[in-house]
A protein has these predicted regions:
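Class I SAM-dependent methyltransferase Rossmann-like catalytic core
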Residues: 1-55
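Structural motif
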Residues: 33, 61-64, 87-88, 134-137
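Well-ordered, non-membrane alpha-helical segments in soluble/globular domains
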Residues: 36-46, 69-73, 97, 140
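Conserved class I S-adenosyl-L-methionine
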Residues: 52-67
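Conserved SAM-binding loop of SAM-dependent methyltransferases across substrates and taxa
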Residues: 65-79
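Conserved SAM-binding motif I beta-strand of class I
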Residues: 79-88
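S-adenosyl-L-methionine
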Residues: 88-131
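A short SAM/SAH-binding and catalytic strip from SAM-dependent methyltransferases
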Residues: 128-140
Length: 140
């Protein structure tokens, strides 16, 4: 995994997300777009590939804005049908959708506001998750 595919669709979505962020939320968006965030997500995707994992329905725990991980996963695993980002920070939801507009429009991505430490993540409408990715294990 050497790069993130920066497509015209991604450029549009990211511009809209960053333009929509204001004040403290803009600072948080910019903080989320650092080298270590991208490198760690690229490493994760590469390791999943090395293990020959073929994810279909992914539960993303504490995915924050998910601007790197969601496109990296979809671009590298044709098997993926669904990614659900479980995040407790209510402020990120609209911007996470802006970053990932194309996946939301295709009904392939959802943000659910949940505390992954205490809330039940599975509901009757949830798919059966075959892959769980914890993006914030150092905080739990």
């Amino acid at each position: 995994m050497e790069y993130l595919k920066y497509t015209p669709e991604m450029a549009r979505d990211w511009k809209n997300a960053i333009s929509a962020s204001e004040g403290y939320l803009r600072k948080r968006v910019l903080d989320s777009m650092n080298e270590s965030q991208l490198v760690s997500k690229m490493w994760l995707v590469e390791e999943l590939s090395n293990l020959n994992v073929k994810p279909v329905n992914i539960s993303l725990l504490a995915g924050w804005f998910a601007q790197y991980i969601v496109p990296l996963l979809y671009d590298n695993f044709e098997s993926i049908e669904w990614i659900e980002n479980f995040e407790m920070d209510r402020d990120i939801k609209s911007l996470a959708y802006k970053f990932n507009t194309r996946y939301k429009k295709e009904d392939k991505y959802k943000v659910s506001i949940k505390n992954v430490m205490f809330d039940n993540l599975v509901s009757l409408s949830s798919p059966t998750f075959d892959t769980v990715i914890n993006c914030s294990c150092e905080h739990m």
